[in-house]
């Protein structure tokens, strides 16, 4: 891909060597890169939608996101802090929202956390240290929270899995800014996800059933 952009390799050469599939993906990556260079404002939802339509093949966007995740993991040791900041800002306003749009929530969180690490270094490590210090008690609390919910859902005859997770560092930082408080002022540090194993025709009904059970317990 980089070789094509620099003129060291031709798309048609890739077509001959690897077939239409690979050539079309390369062509899509080049088109998206050209669009990116020509567009002055890329922080908007309109640009993200335009980029998705230009890509045509969704694999193009997946490669772009994967490439940015890889780059974000590697730039921590670069001496060029200005370039590091630019890459982190792009990850925050373009690639993380794209990952969210495609349902790649884990990658979205990783991109946001790494962006915060480079853009707001002190805030990132403050929150990380606080989370590490409270991990044991938080994990125990999550287990205590999940148990009665699991019992009620099982009594209702539902098939399900419950997962508890600590919210991302970026998410907590956003709450701290919005509420204008320190880490200790944020109480919703974790989230619970209930995943139903239900037939398609009963999905909606059982989702509402779970919602009703949980709200009855915690209203």
Predicted features and spans:
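Nucleic-acid processing machinery
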Residues: 34-61, 68-219
């Amino acid at each position: 891909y980089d070789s094509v952009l620099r003129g060291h390799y031709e798309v048609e050469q890739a077509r001959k060597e690897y077939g239409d599939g690979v050539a079309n993906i390369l062509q899509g990556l080049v088109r998206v890169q050209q669009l990116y260079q020509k567009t002055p404002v890329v922080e908007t939802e309109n640009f993200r939608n335009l980029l998705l339509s230009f890509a045509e093949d969704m694999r193009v966007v997946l490669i772009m996101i994967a490439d940015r995740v890889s780059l974000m993991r590697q730039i921590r040791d670069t001496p060029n802090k200005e370039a590091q900041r630019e890459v982190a800002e792009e990850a925050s306003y373009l690639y993380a929202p794209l990952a969210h749009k495609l349902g790649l929530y884990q990658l979205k969180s990783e991109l946001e956390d790494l962006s915060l690490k480079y853009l707001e270094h002190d805030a990132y490590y403050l929150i990380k240290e606080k989370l590490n210090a409270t991990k044991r008690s938080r994990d125990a609390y999550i287990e205590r929270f999940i148990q009665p919910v699991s019992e009620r859902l099982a009594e209702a005859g539902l098939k399900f899995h419950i997962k508890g997770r600590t919210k991302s560092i970026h998410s907590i930082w956003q709450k701290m800014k919005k509420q204008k408080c320190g880490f200790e002022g944020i109480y919703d540090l974790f989230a619970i996800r209930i995943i139903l194993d239900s037939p398609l025709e009963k999905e909606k009904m059982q989702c509402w059933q779970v919602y009703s059970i949980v709200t009855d317990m915690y209203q």
